[in-house]
Amino acid sequence: MQIYHNGENELYIAEAGRFNIEGFIGWHNLDDLIDKNKLVNLPDFSHSQIQTFIGSIGSLKGYDLWIPSNDRNKLDWDMADKFFCRNELPTRYEKIINVIKEIDVIWLKRGSSELKAMFEVEHSTPINSGLLRFNDLYLAVPNLKSKFSIVSNDIRRSLFLSQFNRPTFRMSGLSDICNFLEYKDVYSWFRRIRKRV
């Protein structure tokens, strides 16, 4: 679950809607609850390494994968076991194929054309480029039941929130179904799921 506060006494919980805030707990109170001994410094991950982690997670969860062909030779196989990527996207998305084929990682239901999750890794590119791709897809494909995630480092969260709250994304409904994943969360997810297999 992801929770955002827009600074105007409105609380947003991804995939749950907006609520008025009745109470407040300060960051210092939350900071006191964190066990500092359990914090780990992570390396600075590259765009390709994060793509590799997300692809590996999808593969381990049983999804078919799409990663743009020009990114595939940059995947970091020292970080994860090799996985297979589809060479073509489903023809049912032909009218918007030029948008979809640029999405950094797509999980598809195995053996089908159903898009289950999409990830845009925004390492140095503008945050809104991924949001605009998602918005185009969301508007062009009615009844799409997919998850949309912008993935970046924590430093870029505020940039995500400023773009995420633009009227175009609120009016389309994308702001209700899109979330932000930090690199550290992707890495933790990757480590957890790899241990289970």
Please annotate each region the language model reported:
Residues 49-63, 108-127:
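Short, solvent-exposed linear motifs at loop/edge-of-secondary-structure regions
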Residues 1-36:
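Internal, Lys/Arg-enriched amphipathic helical interaction segments that engage polyanionic partners
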Residues 43, 59, 67-113, 194-195:
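Active-site metal-binding core of divalent-cation-utilizing nuclease and nuclease-like domains
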Residues 92, 98-103, 112-176:
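Catalytic cores of nucleic-acid endonucleases
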Residues 26-70, 95-96:
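Nuclease catalytic cores
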Residues 2-5, 65-68, 150:
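A structural signal for short, well-ordered beta-strand segments and their strand-loop junctions
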Residues 11-16, 154-197:
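Domain-level recognition of nuclease-like catalytic cores that cleave nucleotide substrates
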